[in-house]
Amino acid sequence: MQQIQRDIAQALQVQPPFRTEADVQAQIARRIAFIQQCLKDSGLKTLVLGISGGVDSLTAGLLAQRAVEQLREQSGDQAYRFIAVRLPYQVQQDEADAQASLATIRADEEQTVNIGPSVKALAEQLEALEGLEPAKSDFVIGNIKARIRMVAQYAIAGARGGLVIGTDHAAEAVMGFFTKFGDGACDLAPLSGLAKHQVRALARALGAPENLVEKIPTADLEDLRPGHPDEASHGVTYAEIDAFLHGQPLREEAARVIIDTYHKTQHKRELPKAP
């Protein structure tokens, strides 16, 4: 089991566990520099990120805002900016957390796009949804929500000349816990390689409120299961996923779930196949 843990961790470029606060600060500096270099390489000046109210988008948003603030100071170019985007589906049940995230990030600009009308309009036109069991239809529409959110972010980025930031990290990547070409689509993923507790450590060091740092993660895509916890979908806890990624002991059953899920979702982590 240890060898396959190492193989998967290497494939996902998992970062070593943090030993000290200096390790956390080094990762913050590294990821801010990464964001800045992506902007410089692209020739663009704007970053776009959807803010959900969860710790992942909060952390990525804090990194993004710091990145552009430093670029403005270093270069004297005031065109560098970060746009934080709220993308609720009708009324979001944890909207207060999303607003608290925005207040913490203090982005240069905030926009709101309610995806409810677009999702409903598309769902009404899809003959493929007719006759489906309610749970299956709800799942498919949940993925539509994620993809519409990414369409909106890329529309803003296209209009403003920017790059779209993703929030994927190693704990989600190993489980394939993202919508293909939805929240899995982005131009840069500054949280890549981090375990879930490491994302929380960065958020905490960046000044995020503890209630948002330790908030129970949920994709919240399905109407029939509002606020459904990620861990309930995984069948394992984030603590177990993190232990697996760092080559630490964990329940054999949990390790098997993670390995099986990793293989089943491999297609999500690959580019489209070609002849």
From Swiss-Prot:
Recorded GO MF terms: ATP binding; glutaminase activity; metal ion binding; NAD+ synthase (glutamine-hydrolyzing) activity; NAD+ synthase activity
Pathway the protein takes part in: Cofactor biosynthesis; NAD(+) biosynthesis; NAD(+) from deamido-NAD(+) (ammonia route): step 1/1
Annotated EC: 6.3.1.5
Residues in the signal sequence: none
Residues the record lists as binding deamido-NAD(+): R147, K180, D187, H267, K268
Keyword flag Glycoprotein: no
Residues involved in Mg(2+) binding: D56, E172
GO cellular component, one term: cytoplasm
Chain sites annotated for binding ATP: G50, I51, S52, G53, G54, V55, D56, S57, T167, K196, T218
Pfam families per UniProt: NAD_synthase
GO-annotated biological processes: NAD biosynthetic process
Group of enzyme by EC: ligase
Magnesium in keyword set: yes
CDD domains: NAD_synthase
Regions annotated as coiled coil: none
This protein's UniProt keywords: ATP-binding, Ligase, Magnesium, Metal-binding, NAD, Nucleotide-binding
Catalyzed reactions: deamido-NAD(+) + NH4(+) + ATP = AMP + diphosphate + NAD(+) + H(+)
Similarity annotation: Belongs to the NAD synthetase family.
Subunit structure: Homodimer.
Function of the protein: Catalyzes the ATP-dependent amidation of deamido-NAD to form NAD. Uses ammonia as a nitrogen source.
Protein name, UniProt field: NH(3)-dependent NAD(+) synthetase
UniProt gene name: nadE
